[in-house]
């Protein structure tokens, strides 16, 4: 006589509870379509309807690279050693050249091995810095108006956004008196961007020194997003050149 097999733990197929539907992570619930993506679609619709929209939004070059640049890229692409994986921190020659560039234009000495990280774009940098410094609920100071990525990445990592106003009557610079009156408890990071997008306002050594002093006073990381330093600017400036070190301790301000 055939023995009856014991029932499998968990019951039969008919009695197993239904597996819940897979849902996205909570961190993406507040993520919206990127600002410029929405605007470019809007511009495309306007152009299709006959409007001639002049796009002053994204800082995309409207001129091609120089012939010498294109030739150098073609020569590099033809080399057999340029098509594999690169080091995760960039090749040493590239980082060393970045360090020489900072010394030449800003008078800043940087350690290529520990203070330079090549990235594929500013968004990657904003994400890396936010992930490195911001826990859920930490405060981050974001300029208004300002680069939309600061806010979108801050929302993604669950940070608490504290906008600070840039006003024309103040030359589009932070109002430090207003900042000092804010509740800065829990604030760990402050984004600034000069030459500024979207106002076009330029920075100054005096402004950067105020930002450095503000960051040190409140133990806030100041991150200077500096992609427009050489656009219509006779005196390119980096916040790193304004650091006044009082000891050989590690750098206490993050910038570019």
What are the residue ranges of the model-derived segments?
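N-terminal small-domain helix-loop-helix segment of the aminotransferase-like
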Residues: 6-8, 13-25, 29-121, 128
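Aromatic/hydrophobic pocket-lining residues that form π-stacking "cages" and hydrophobic walls in ligand
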Residues: 39, 43, 150, 211, ...
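Conserved PLP-anchoring active-site segment centered on the Schiff-base-forming lysine
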Residues: 132-154
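Active-site phosphate-binding strand-loop segment of PLP-dependent enzymes
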Residues: 162, 166-234
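Short acidic capping loops at alpha-helix termini that bridge into adjacent secondary structure
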Residues: 109-116, 136-139, 186, 247
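Single conserved hydrophobic/aromatic residue that forms the stacking wall/gate
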Residues: 245-256
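A short helix-loop-beta submotif of the ANL/AMP-binding
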Residues: 156-161
């Amino acid at each position: 006589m055939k023995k009856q097999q014991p029932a499998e733990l968990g019951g039969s197929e008919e009695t197993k509870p239904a597996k819940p539907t897979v849902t996205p992570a909570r961190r993406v619930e507040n993520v919206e379509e990127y600002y410029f993506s929405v605007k470019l679609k809007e511009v495309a619709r306007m152009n299709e309807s006959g409007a001639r929209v002049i796009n002053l939004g994204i800082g995309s070059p409207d001129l091609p690279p120089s012939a010498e640049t294109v030739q150098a890229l073609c020569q590099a692409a033809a080399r057999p050693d340029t098509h594999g994986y690169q080091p995760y921190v960039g090749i040493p020659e590239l980082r060393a050249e970045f360090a020489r560039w900072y010394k030449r234009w800003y008078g800043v000495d940087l350690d290529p091995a520990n203070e330079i990280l090549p990235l594929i774009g500013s968004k990657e940098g904003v994400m890396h810095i936010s992930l490195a410094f911001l826990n859920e609920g930490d405060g981050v100071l974001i300029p208004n108006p300002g680069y939309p990525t600061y806010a979108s990445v801050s929302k993604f990592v669950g940070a608490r956004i504290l906008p600070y106003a840039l006003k024309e009557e103040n030359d589009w610079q932070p109002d430090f008196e207003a900042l000092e009156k804010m509740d800065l408890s829990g604030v760990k990071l402050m984004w600034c961007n000069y030459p500024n997008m979207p106002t076009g306002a330029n920075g100054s050594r005096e402004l950067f020194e105020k930002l450095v002093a503000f960051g040190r006073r409140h133990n806030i990381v100041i991150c200077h997003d500096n992609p427009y330093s050489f656009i219509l600017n006779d005196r390119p400036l980096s916040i790193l050149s304004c650091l006044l070190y009082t000891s050989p301790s590690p750098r206490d301000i993050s910038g570019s």
